[in-house]
Regions:
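Specific alpha-helical transmembrane segments that line the substrate/conduction pathway
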Residues: 36-47, 85-119, 156
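Transmembrane alpha-helices of multi-pass small-molecule transport proteins
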Residues: 29-80, 107-108, 159-166, 181-200
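Residue-level signature of transmembrane alpha-helical cores of multipass secondary-active transporters
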Residues: 7-10, 70-74, 86, 98, ...
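Membrane-interface helix caps and helix-loop-helix hairpins in membrane proteins
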Residues: 87-92, 139-148, 200-206
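Glycine-/small-residue-enriched transmembrane alpha-helix faces in small-molecule transporters
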Residues: 1-36, 40, 144-169, 190-194, ...
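Hydrophobic core positions of alpha-helical segments in small-molecule transporters
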Residues: 12, 40, 73, 100-103, ...
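Hydrophobic transmembrane alpha-helices of multi-pass small-molecule transport proteins
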Residues: 49, 111, 120-140, 152, ...
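Specific transmembrane alpha-helical segments of multi-pass solute transporters/efflux pumps
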Residues: 16-21, 53-101, 137, 215
C-alpha cells in the first residue's frame, strides 16, 4: 500500500509540476523578472501552506540544526534548481525544458549508487539508458540547438537530484514532510526576495492575472 501511495503521489507531483510552465511562460513574456516570479510563486505557496498547517495545529518549531539544514535545502537545492529551470525557459520551449528536468531521478539513482553504495537493479539501469535516450531526443531539433538552454535545464536536473539525494541522508528525513516542504518554500522565497531587492529587480505586481498564475 505504501509503495502504491508513493507511486500515486509521484505521478500527481509530476502532473502538477508539468503545469508550471503554462503560467511561468506568460509572466516571462510580460517582462517580469525571474526573481520576482520566484518570490511570488514560493512566497504565496509557503504562506498558504503555513496557514494550512497552523489550522491543523501542526508543530512548526525547528531546532537550530533543522533551521540550518532547511535553509541550505531551500537555497542550495530548491532555490538554485528554480533559478536554472526558469532561465532555461528563456532559451527553449517550456514544455521541453520541464520534460528534460524530470531526468532528475536518474541523477538521484546515480548519486545513491556512487556515494552511498546502493545497488542498481537491472530494470533501473535500463530505465537510466532509456531516460538518457529520451533527453537526447527531446534536445534534438532540426535547426540550431539552444545549448545555453540545455545547459540550464541539465543544471536544474543535477541540482534537484542532489537536493533529493541529500534529503534522504540528512536530519531532514526525520522531519514531518509537510513542515519541511513549507519551510523550504518560505526559505526559497526569502532568498529570492533578498536577491531581487539587492539587484533592483523586485516588482510589486497587483495584476489579478499574474497573482492567479502564481497561485
Amino acid at each position: 500500500m505504501d509503495k502504491f501511495k508513493g507511486i500515486l503521489f509521484a505521478a500527481l507531483s509530476a502532473a502538477t509540476f508539468g503545469l508550471i510552465p503554462l503560467y511561468a511562460n506568460q509572466a516571462i513574456l510580460d517582462g517580469v523578472f525571474n526573481e520576482t516570479i520566484l518570490v511570488y510563486r514560493y512566497g504565496i505557496a509557503g504562506i498558504v501552506y503555513a496557514i494550512y498547517l497552523l489550522f491543523r495545529r501542526m508543530n512548526m518549531r525547528l531546532t537550530r540544526r533543522e533551521v540550518k539544514e532547511v535553509s541550505l535545502a531551500g537555497v542550495g537545492g530548491y532555490g538554485i534548481t528554480a533559478f536554472f529551470l526558469m532561465w532555461s525557459y528563456h532559451y527553449m520551449p517550456t514544455g521541453v525544458a520541464t520534460a528534460i528536468h524530470f531526468f532528475y531521478p536518474v541523477v538521484v539513482a546515480l548519486l545513491m549508487a556512487i556515494f552511498y553504495k546502493e545497488r542498481l537493479p537491472l530494470e533501473v539501469k535500463a530505465g537510466i539508458v532509456l531516460a538518457i535516450c529520451g533527453v537526447y531526443l527531446l534536445s534534438w531539433t532540426p535547426g540550431e540547438v539552444k545549448w545555453l538552454g540545455l545547459f540550464f535545464v541539465l543544471m536544474s536536473t543535477v541540482t534537484y537530484g542532489c537536493y533529493i539525494a541529500a534529503l534522504n541522508r540528512s536530519v531532514l528525513k526525520r522531519m514531518n514532510p509537510d513542515v519541511l516542504t513549507c519551510y523550504v518554500l518560505l526559505f526559497t522565497a526569502l532568498f529570492y526576495l533578498i536577491l531581487a531587492v539587492a539587484q533592483g529587480k523586485m516588482e510589486i505586481i497587483t495584476r489579478p492575472r499574474f497573482l492567479l498564475d502564481m497561485v
